[in-house]
Structure formats: structure tokens, C-alpha cells
């Protein structure tokens, strides 16, 4: 099974691709991780088009069986609406490719990986390293967060 984890954002969308041999019940292995970045000098609409285009390329390249997206919870921020809109672009693109999608709020991701819904970013990143048997934390943070979302999907299956 191939799982694509996504951490939504307007400037940067983190992604992480995991591979799991379900018959052997192996631990997930990281196939790829990184970010989709958009040009801050462009309008929001153009940036959404960039996100959709780059996600389509990732979907064609990695052919995930399942996508997991961080469910945004609201807080007061000047970019809240833009992030929610970018998340909508991700969900729409996944639907167009008919990829089953699950969503998890940050607290559930932290609980699944670090054992506490109030874990800090470092604790979650350490758990990602441990679960994927990595020697160092994935960079940038958005990619590490996306791997955490993907791992949560594997743990919650």
C-alpha cells in the first residue's frame, strides 16, 4: 500500500510518500518527501493552480492508494482562509484522481505518533524518525509533518 500524507499550506504544502507491504505487515518506509512551494509574488488564484498542478504530478509519479490530509482547525491568523482554500484544492485534486482520502486533526496526529495530543513538534518529528528508521529529521518541517499525517493513516487503518 502506498500512502500520501499532505500538510496543507498556501506558501508550502508538505508531502510524504510511504510504502507498506500489507501482507508482511512491515513498518512503513519513506519513498519520498518534500514540499510543493508557490511563488509569493503571484495572486492566490495562481498559487492554487500551482498547488493543483504540482499535486497532479506527484499523484502520477507515486500513484498512492490512500491520501491522508491534515484537517485544519481554526485559529486567528491572517492566512487562515488562504490555507483552508489550499486544503480545498488538495481535496478536490485527490477526488478527481479518485484517491480515497482520510483527514486527521493535529491533536490526533500528535496522539498517534507521540502518545500525547499535546506533544510538541520535536516529539512528533522524533517519532517520525523512529517509525521510519531515519537517521535525521526530514526537512523541511512541512515534509516531516506530512510524513506524520501519512503514518497516522497507517496506524489508524
Curated annotation (Swiss-Prot):
Question: Cofactor: bound how, per the entry note?
Answer: Binds 2 Mg(2+) ion per subunit.
Task: Spell out the family assignment given in the record's similarity comment.
Answer: Belongs to the RuvC family.
- Top-level enzyme category: hydrolase
Q: Which HAMAP family match?
A: RuvC
Which gene is annotated as encoding this protein in its UniProt record?
A: ruvC
Q: Which residues does UniProt assign to the signal peptide?
A: none
Which GO terms fall under molecular function for this chain's record?
Answer: crossover junction DNA endonuclease activity; DNA binding; magnesium ion binding
Q: What is the lineage of its organism?
A: Bacteria, Bacillati, Cyanobacteriota, Cyanophyceae, Synechococcales
Q: Which domain of life is it from?
A: Bacteria
Question: Which residues are listed for Mg(2+) 2 binding in this entry?
Answer: 70
What is the name listed in the Swiss-Prot or TrEMBL entry for this protein? Answer: Crossover junction endodeoxyribonuclease RuvC
InterPro entries given for it?
Answer: RNaseH-like_sf, RNaseH_sf, X-over_junc_endoDNase_RuvC
The record lists the organism as Synechococcus sp. (strain RCC307)
Q: Which cofactor does it need?
A: Mg(2+)
Positions bound to Mg(2+) 1: 7, 142
GO biological process terms, alphabetically, are: DNA recombination; DNA repair
Amino acid at each position: 500500500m502506498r500512502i500520501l500524507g499532505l500538510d496543507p499550506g498556501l506558501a508550502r504544502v508538505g508531502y510524504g510518500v510511504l510504502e507498506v507491504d500489507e501482507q508482511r505487515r512491515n513498518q512503513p518506509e519513506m519513498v519520498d518527501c518534500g514540499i510543493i512551494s508557490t511563488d509569493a509574488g503571484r495572486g492566490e488564484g495562481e498559487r492554487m493552480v500551482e498547488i493543483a498542478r504540482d499535486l497532479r504530478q506527484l499523484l502520477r509519479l507515486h500513484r498512492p492508494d490512500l491520501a491522508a490530509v491534515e484537517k485544519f482547525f481554526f485559529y486567528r491568523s491572517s492566512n487562515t482562509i488562504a490555507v483552508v482554500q489550499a486544503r480545498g484544492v488538495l481535496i478536490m485534486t485527490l477526488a478527481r484522481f479518485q484517491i480515497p482520502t482520510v483527514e486527521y486533526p493535529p491533536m490526533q496526529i500528535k496522539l498517534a505518533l507521540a502518545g500525547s495530543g499535546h506533544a510538541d513538534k520535536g516529539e512528533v518529528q522524533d517519532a517520525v524518525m523512529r517509525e521510519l528508521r531515519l537517521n535525521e529529521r526530514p526537512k523541511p518541517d512541512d515534509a516531516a509533518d506530512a510524513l506524520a499525517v501519512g503514518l497516522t493513516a497507517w496506524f489508524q487503518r
